[in-house]
Design a protein with these regions (language model features):
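Bacterial N-terminal signal peptides
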Residues: 7-14
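A well-ordered secondary-structure block
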Residues: 85-169, 202, 206-208, 250-251, ...
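Positively charged n-region of N-terminal signal peptides that target proteins for export
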Residues: 1-4
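Second-shell loop/turn segments in exported
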Residues: 21-32, 46-56, 73-76, 101-116, ...
Length: 323
């Protein structure tokens, strides 16, 4: 029953255009464009029988800040000069859910009229949806059947336009969220509950080195991202031995996973779980992914969190993670 749990990756678009040297973004225009892009996203999802995503205010604010940082640092894609991956950026800003990112960038040379902004946004969404496998990361992100919310970031200034879509998978209600920074490698207690109708399938903890600052040219050369391969997998505790009635008598059942283990953490019938997350691999970024699955389903498990925890090389402050 041990399973390989795969993470989502996405790709970034960069466009050149004979568009815009113009004014900075106004909040009214941004809100109008955001609502229109959400309509486009849900239109595209509806064509494939998928439920609409709801606009998420927190994720939109995170995406806006990232778009502004991209223009400030002259970067495109998923990384800016701090070296943080998208899931780190979302988590360190307070996000507790699963997240996958699409990004588009335009460089321009005339004024940003409302019509020009709308056209860049429309063409970005259309280009993403026109992708063909296997190079269809944006399209698959938009059409993720597990996405429940979306954050939409927009920024334009000095002839640059940036658009970021953060697709959120919200299936865990955290009663004890994980911190975002710790000073020691002691296990960290967390607890929560899976959304009604979903079961907790497992927890993976991915480890990677602390991000390092990078030049804009280096950040712009990175076209994709994914969680690191280095990970540890933890599974719900099984019942152990129990009896069940069968034709002609009673049999004893002994539950175990394929490696002979009985699991690592308790999950209650109502979906509540608690686990002390180990941090055994030294300093770095530990990203905690809680996997859930619709009750009774044999389909793919859903990565319902991307919570990144920073363990410094030396003692540091503890930062609470909230939503």
């Amino acid at each position: 029953m041990k399973k390989l749990l795969l993470a989502v990756l996405t790709i970034a678009f960069t466009f050149g255009a004979t568009l815009a040297q113009g004014e900075g973004a106004s909040e009214e225009t941004r809100m109008t464009l955001r609502a229109e892009l959400l309509r486009m996203i849900n239109r595209d999802r509806a064509k494939f029988g998928l439920t609409p995503v709801q606009l998420d205010g927190q994720a939109s604010a995170i995406a806006d800040a990232y778009c502004q940082a991209q223009i400030r640092n002259r970067t495109t894609g998923h990384f800016t000069t701090d070296g943080a991956a998208p899931y780190m950026r979302y988590s360190f800003a307070g996000g507790n859910d699963g997240v996958s990112e699409n990004a588009a960038a335009w460089s321009a040379n005339y004024g940003f009229s409302d019509r020009a902004l709308y056209d860049m946004m429309r063409r970005s969404e259309a280009a993403m949806m026109s992708e063909v496998a296997p190079h269809d990361g944006h399209r698959r992100t938009i059409l993720d059947p597990a996405a429940t919310h979306a954050g939409i970031g927009l920024a334009w200034e000095r002839g640059e336009f940036r658009l970021t879509e953060e697709f959120i998978r919200r299936y865990v209600e955290w009663s004890r969220p994980l911190p975002r920074g710790v000073a020691t490698s002691q296990p960290i207690l967390c607890s929560g509950r899976a959304a009604r109708g979903y079961d907790v399938e497992g927890i993976t903890v991915h480890h990677e080195a602390l991000p390092l600052p990078m030049a804009a040219v280096t950040a712009n050369a990175i076209e994709t991202y994914k969680l690191p391969e280095s990970k540890r997998e933890y599974l719900p505790r099984l019942k152990g031995r129990f009896t069940q009635r069968i034709a002609g008598g009673i049999e004893e059942v002994h539950e175990e996973y394929s490696d002979g283990s009985r699991g690592d953490f308790q999950v209650a019938p109502d979906g509540k779980f608690a686990f002390a997350i180990p941090l055994p691999d030294g300093p770095g970024i530990y990203t905690v992914v809680v996997w859930v699955r619709p009750h009774g389903s044999s389909g793919d498990a859903i990565p319902a969190s991307n919570v990144s925890i920073r363990l410094e090389r030396s003692a540091g402050a503890l930062i609470s993670g909230t939503r």
